[in-house]
Amino acid sequence: MVGAEGRWREKGNDQRRGRKKRGGVEESGHRAAFLETAGTLKPNHRAGGASGHCPPSGGHFGNAAAPTARARPSGSAGHHRGLCQEEEDLSVVCGLSPAGVYSHPDHWPCCNHQDRECDCGRLLPRDYFAASIVFLSFGVVAAFCCAIVDSVFAARHIEPRPLSAGRCQFYSSGAGYLYDVYQTEVTCYSLNGRCQLKVRSNTCYCCDLYACGSTEPSPAYYEFVGVRSCQDVVHLYRLLWVSTVLNVLGLCLGIVTAAVLGAFKDMVPLSQLAYGPSPPPQILYNPAQQILAYTGLCPPSMGVPTCSSYPLPLQPSSAPPASASADLSLPEDTESPSQCQPSRGCSHAPSPCTPAYFLPGEKPPPYAP
């Protein structure tokens, strides 16, 4: 790649030196070849591979001077469209404008995206946007699940009122004991009497939440094992609600971000809207006047002549521009071609042109010699 780049630069330097000797009359050979290639491009065609005569990545075309107006071929005259609409032009240029020929951004130095398709001026390729939306969807689903789990756990299994009121006790069992190997029995008092509760070391227990003599488990946790104090349980309760709020916020932001990326993926560059191909002319048919009007081809101030019975596609090539549109069919009482004024260019001889075509369902006028 480095050797090819050096050869292209040496070729450009030799051509610049030769152009200076000849007074700047000749154009650069490689630039004229690229302009000729640009003039024969088709906007919607995509080729399978790169062009064989393209310069390597990082050539001197990024700083190429602006080509003169007379050097631009007829195929690209007046069009400031980007040449990156074809995959074969990806390794050559990004755009052709009065300012010059610009190399594609993928072939600037330190670029690692030289093999992707050209996306016509988008911020990122469509695949990147689609992958981002998919990963954001996974994050949105995960945030929703975490918010549900944290909120349900904090709301149903932790009762903060006895903890905040100081009605829970902490049992440590002394130093050197682990909470899973040392157990003791404590006495809890309730409305039904008193009962014995086995607790482990480093446990915060609440007798108000423990149902003495009941075989059904308590809906709320009455003991918390492996804490340093009962205040740690209060902190855990607050952290669960903070995690729920953050997960809900991440859920909303993920949905909004996915929507914005979807909008960016479907955006069209402003250059395509400004310099895109013009739409085909619309054909408007008025059954009352039997006239085919071609919008976009005829000026609105042009009058409709009365001496021609040929529509626009059937006019002879030598006809004047004033006869661009005419009646499709003539009734019996209308003026015949032999009654036209001589100043309008009509002759009494039969017209050598082909008769007009009529729309389906319409009756042609009778033959008049």
Swiss-Prot record:
GO terms for cellular component: membrane. This is Transmembrane protein 255B. Its main location: membrane. Residues 1-80, 318-349 are annotated as: Disordered. Residues 318-329 have a biased composition (Low complexity). It is a multi-pass membrane protein. InterPro entries: TMEM255. Signal peptide: none annotated. Keywords: Membrane, Transmembrane, Transmembrane helix. The gene is Tmem255b. The chain crosses the membrane at residues 129-149, 244-264. Residues 1-16 have a biased composition (Basic and acidic residues). Belongs to the TMEM255 family. It comes from the Eukaryota. Disulfide bonds: none annotated. Pfam families: FAM70. Coiled coil: none annotated. It is found in: Membrane.
